[in-house]
């Protein structure tokens, strides 16, 4: 977000001034709002129209539209409406689209360091902690530096920490590390390198192409993201085995993009409205995910899907693969190493705090619901 500082004082001043303005100058402000020209932005998401992720994109747009009154309107088109999902960044940078909704890992082909916002080792961080690193630990400046290095002219807002993603959907459960060798598997971002190192033949398909590829036998297994998206995209219609828990993309979040020139042309108060709408959407998305994912998890089990915990041996093998990949990529790409070093330093401090302070909620759940 723009002009982020650890202090909450600017936010309080903004809210105080906004409230005072609404109460004290309503008579003057109303005519200005009603006669002001509406700025309309056309966005595209990287998600199919039926995916809950596209719903999240529309949720953000609605917050902007509501908060800005009639002064700023955002319309969000589904993936492929203007450009393919993996071409969103270029389309926004060039002004073909005014903005977009996706994930940073989809830009992996531009610079491998971009995949580290979600698809990477994480160093024990969860998605919420990675967002803390991004906004308070230097990540935002690093992302801007990478975009400048590849001549991408966008304003980027990260938001919406995603729940831990499953290992994936398979025709039969994956019991051993050796089961991954030779498997045709779908994933994206730096996880492509991780699974390739583990012996898989990886195909980084966009979300809308995964289930048809599984159905036709073009791939043996695939991951997308969560119970709600996987159910809506039709995974349980073609395979019935889902492996839960993985380190392949354990720190992912969404990205909202604006074309920089069009964003810069907005007045300061609308830029600030966008800033706070992103934060509101981030909280709302994380709450909705808990509700919807848990409901869809139950529905998937009712539909005959078999869920298995990914064996610890596979999780350890993932971490070992990450060790090799970050060493190799860090040597090849100075920006990659710069991001890795910054994440590791933040994770060492914040992870120690979280691991020591947070109670074992699973213990309480098992106590109350007799789950052994």
Language-model features, listed with the residues they occupy:
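N-terminal secretory/targeting leader peptides
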Residues: 2, 7-28, 35-130, 145-372
